[in-house]
């Protein structure tokens, strides 16, 4: 099988295109949070520890949610969690004491989505294209992440406007992907 066969099949082409948008939104948001970490109030080491702990919790939660509600609903629930964190940040970004809670919500939702897209990639494409599609999506998303440091350096609260827009775009695209395996 050739990569051309991946593109010629309407279902896999659709999954590849919509997954690419979801992955790009996800990875850009992931790195916006990573680069924005230096601006969070408090000790950067404690903030990094909190982010890592929230990642562990979100990875465990992602598997449970995916098993209970399926792919599309788990993508939407993780994006809603991330979007809620960014919306709360946009409204209360001047309240320094609650910002870490909003950032944790953003991080949990984003890390849940990261785990979900990695785990379910093999269900969106035939076996012979699973590795190729994974590589294509990883490459495209990380190329798009080049702009994340620029977004993170924008004045407050613009990075979280971009974060929220990415969540909404990914949420819309999640309705168009279909599992085939």
Stretches with model-predicted labels:
Residues 1-35:
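Flexible cytoplasmic loops linking transmembrane helices in multi-pass membrane transporters
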Residues 23-26, 34-181:
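C-terminal transmembrane bundle
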């Amino acid at each position: 099988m050739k990569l051309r066969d991946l593109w010629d099949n309407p279902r896999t082409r659709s999954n590849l295109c919509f997954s690419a948008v979801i992955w790009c939104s996800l990875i850009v948001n992931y790195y916006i949070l990573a680069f924005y970490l230096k601006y969070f109030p408090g000790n950067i080491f404690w903030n990094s520890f909190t982010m890592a702990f929230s990642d562990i919790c979100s990875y465990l939660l992602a598997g449970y949610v995916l098993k209970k509600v399926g792919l599309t609903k788990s993508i939407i629930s993780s994006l809603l969690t991330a979007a809620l964190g960014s919306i709360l940040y946009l409204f209360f970004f001047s309240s320094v004491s609650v910002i870490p809670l909003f950032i944790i919500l953003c991080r949990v939702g984003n890390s849940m989505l990261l785990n979900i897209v990695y785990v379910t990639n093999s269900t969106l494409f035939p076996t012979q294209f699973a590795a190729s599609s994974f590589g294509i999506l990883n490459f495209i998303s990380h190329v798009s992440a080049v702009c994340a440091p620029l977004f993170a350096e924008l004045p407050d609260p613009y990075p979280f406007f971009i974060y929220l827009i990415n969540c909404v775009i990914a949420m819309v695209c999640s309705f168009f992907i279909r599992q085939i395996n």
